[in-house]
Amino acid sequence: MKVRSSVKKICDKCRVIRRKGRVMIICAQPKHKQRQG
């Protein structure tokens, strides 16, 4: 899980979701998991 100020889709399997007011990226590739901190 990468914590970044700006989250971007890395590949076309990345999905932008919102959980508890946080913007997160979930993907089939675990390396691409990010959340906004």
Curated annotation (Swiss-Prot):
Signal peptide: none annotated. One of its GO terms (cellular component) is ribosome. The keyword Ribosomal protein applies. One of its GO terms (biological process) is translation. The keyword Translocase does not apply. InterPro entries: Ribosomal_bL36, Ribosomal_bL36_sp. PANTHER family: 50S RIBOSOMAL PROTEIN L36, CHLOROPLASTIC (PTHR42888), LARGE RIBOSOMAL SUBUNIT PROTEIN BL36C (PTHR42888:SF1). This is Large ribosomal subunit protein bL36. It comes from Mesoplasma florum (strain ATCC 33453 / NBRC 100688 / NCTC 11704 / L1) (Acholeplasma florum).
